[in-house]
Amino acid sequence: MQPLRFLVLSPSGIKLDQAIISAQVKTTNGYLGLNYNRAPLIAAVQSHFCKILFANNTRRNAIIGAGLVLIKKTEAKIFTENFVFEDEIDLEATLKRKAELERQMNHSKDLKLNIKIEQNLMFELLKLSNKQR
């Protein structure tokens, strides 16, 4: 099977740039399988738990925040602010970040800021729920 170039891009840089066999991405219309030679597509991505099978046949799980996916025949790019591999989650830092986001939400009156805080809080909650499995 041909590998697909898989990139996860964020404002802080390239989080992942590797060849994969497949990955599952949750869009607003449901889950989407990524693999080589897929029809081009642009879709909104929801925060989700993602299973990735790399070209070297290793598997890793990741948590991807809300964003956008751009799919071409030979590559897929996800644009998001939040991405972390399951085995790299720091439980203590995640709990601190969650508490800080909850505090910010309780004190904010700005609707746009609250939406941003909610997206980041959702990502932290996904990390915590994944660690408890």
Swiss-Prot record:
HAMAP family: ATP_synth_epsil_bac (MF_00530)
Location of the protein in the cell: Cell membrane
Manganese as UniProt keyword: no
Protein name: ATP synthase epsilon chain
Top-level taxonomy: Bacteria, Bacillati, Mycoplasmatota, Mycoplasmoidales, Mycoplasmoidaceae
Similarity field: Belongs to the ATPase epsilon chain family.
Record function comment: Produces ATP from ADP in the presence of a proton gradient across the membrane.
Keywords associated with the record: ATP synthesis, Cell membrane, CF(1), Hydrogen ion transport, Ion transport, Membrane, Transport
Species for this entry: Mycoplasma pneumoniae (strain ATCC 29342 / M129 / Subtype 1) (Mycoplasmoides pneumoniae)
Membrane topology: Peripheral membrane protein
Top-level division of the source organism's lineage: Bacteria
Quaternary structure and interacting proteins, as annotated: F-type ATPases have 2 components, CF(1) - the catalytic core - and CF(0) - the membrane proton channel. CF(1) has five subunits: alpha(3), beta(3), gamma(1), delta(1), epsilon(1). CF(0) has three main subunits: a, b and c.
MF term (GO), any: proton-transporting ATP synthase activity, rotational mechanism
Gene coding for it: atpC
GO CC term (a single one): proton-transporting ATP synthase complex
InterPro entries the UniProt entry points to: ATP_synth_F1_dsu/esu (IPR001469), ATP_synth_F1_dsu/esu_N (IPR020546), ATPsynth_dsu/esu_N (IPR036771)
NCBIfam families documented for this protein: PRK00539.1 (NF001812)
Keyword Protein biosynthesis: no
